[in-house]
Amino acid sequence: MAAAGWRDGSGQEKYRLVVVGGGGVGKSALTIQFIQSYFVTDYDPTIEDSYTKQCVIDDRAARLDILDTAGQEEFGAMREQYMRTGEGFLLVFSVTDRGSFEEIYKFQRQILRVKDRDEFPMILIGNKADLDHQRQVTQEEGQQLARQLKVTYMEASAKIRMNVDQAFHELVRVIRKFQEQECPPSPEPTRKEKDKKGCHCVIF
């Protein structure tokens, strides 16, 4: 079977996802909407929350451990600690906040530095897409940034549950593809090798 996130005792695939982005972009709202199908209206700055959800993605059962991180700068060191264990990252900005869009570069570079990699599983999410009248970042700008970062771009809305499940599921697909490239499955033995293994000589 193809490589996957590490498996628990039941053989189920398990993935560690980390949600990162600036303060107030809706990271917690996206996460809670995905986990509990509930929209959080009050903004309460997160220090760190973790959630677990069982899913079936492309006919493969998976357990997702999701870490919702602090956007505030004073929690930067704590965020790096979580980045070390993450297997995939949702880079979240608000389409109504130009500053949060410009911060994405910082988060992406921080992840790659912590991982000591040139690339790593991430997707870019433009949240609050329902607030089109307050938009400060166009869809084209989001797509352009995603091309520069070599990641998938989606616009989402935690409020109206737009592309919420799709965002988390797509990140799992990106992780699976990355892990399969890193650790490709062992090739099937050839007929000749099978015959060789099946041949036993008995000497009298």
Curated annotation (Swiss-Prot):
Modified residues (Cysteine methyl ester): C201
Compartment(s) where it occurs, according to its Swiss-Prot or TrEMBL record: Cell membrane; Golgi apparatus membrane
EC identifiers of the protein: 3.6.5.2
Entry-linked Pfam families: Ras
One GO term describing the cellular component: membrane
PANTHER family (UniProt xref): RAS, DI-RAS, AND RHEB FAMILY MEMBERS OF SMALL GTPASE SUPERFAMILY
Function, as annotated: GTP-binding protein with GTPase activity, involved in the regulation of MAPK signaling pathway and thereby controlling multiple cellular processes. Regulates craniofacial development.
Annotated protein name in UniProt: Ras-related protein R-Ras2
Source organism: Homo sapiens
